[in-house]
Amino acid sequence: MKKNRTYYLLGGIILLLVVIRLCSHSEPRQEFTPRDYPDIVRSGILRAVTEYNSISYHVDQDSVSGFDYELLNAFAQSKHLQLEMTPEMSFEERLKGITEGKYDLIATGTVVTTRSKDTLLFTHPLLLSKQILVQRKQEKGKDSLYIHNQLELGGKTLHVVKGSPALLRIHNLINEIADTIYIQEVDQYGPEQLMAMVSGGDIDYAVCDENIAKANIRLYSNLDVNTDISFTQFYAWGVAKHAPVLLDSLNAWLDQYTKSEDYRKLYKKYFH
């Protein structure tokens, strides 16, 4: 009798998997049309993509927080728009979503470089930050692992979020120090998860945004974030090349809002 019940159970599971597979194949792939600001206003919905971290976008039970989330939500409310914000850890997927029209803008601090300007239109700079090395603090007997400066990166493996703008800087460093730096791109984790992995000893080095690293360093008493990988750079939101009117609308609003007391309170909340 038990054997029959087992067969029935297995048969039911197999049938369920077949039904799910058939449904997934029959479900049409959602198509998106690239939009500019007038299209967004007509729809009443602003679609943004961001990175899930304590600075940009963070969900804690029923509350949503984050500098980029709160700032963009203020813009949306001022324009009577509903904000839809999607977290996406992969920079490449965020860029793909913008290009295909799935999202209207990337609302997380994105480094403004000559290369990134080839694919995105950037708002006026929102922040200044830089890429830093996350490593464990110097320990007796393990000093060989501690990096004092960029010249000591030769032969080391740096873990970086896949598609991160930090990759370009690391490749430049390879030329500058005339030595090999191994790069391990990670697509399933963000910078905060990489920090936890360094702290736990799973990896030795990661490259993260300084603002995110400083916001989380209090959680890890054994971490050091004092070695710079890049110089200070501008960070901004990015919109698609096909959305110049959206860019102008964002910039006009940001120019006014960043002078307000509300913005000063918001900035102080996330950047002390």
Model features per residue range: what roles?
Residues V18-Q30, G163-V186, S221-N226, Y257-H272:
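Ligand-binding clefts/hinges and TM-proximal coupling segments of bilobed small-molecule sensing domains
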Residues F75, I98-T99, L153, M197-S199, ...:
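Hydrophobic residues within well-ordered alpha-helices
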Residues Y52, L127-Q135, K140, D187, ...:
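Periplasmic-binding protein-like
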Residues Y8-L22:
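Hydrophobic membrane-insertion alpha-helices, especially the h-region
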Residues K137-L158:
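Flexible hinge/capping segments at coil-to-helix
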Residues E92, K96-T99, T108-T119, R169-E176, ...:
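A ligand-binding cleft/hinge motif common to bilobed small-molecule-binding domains
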Residues Y8-L9, S26-T110, T114, D118, ...:
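Extracytoplasmic small-molecule ligand-binding "clamshell" domains
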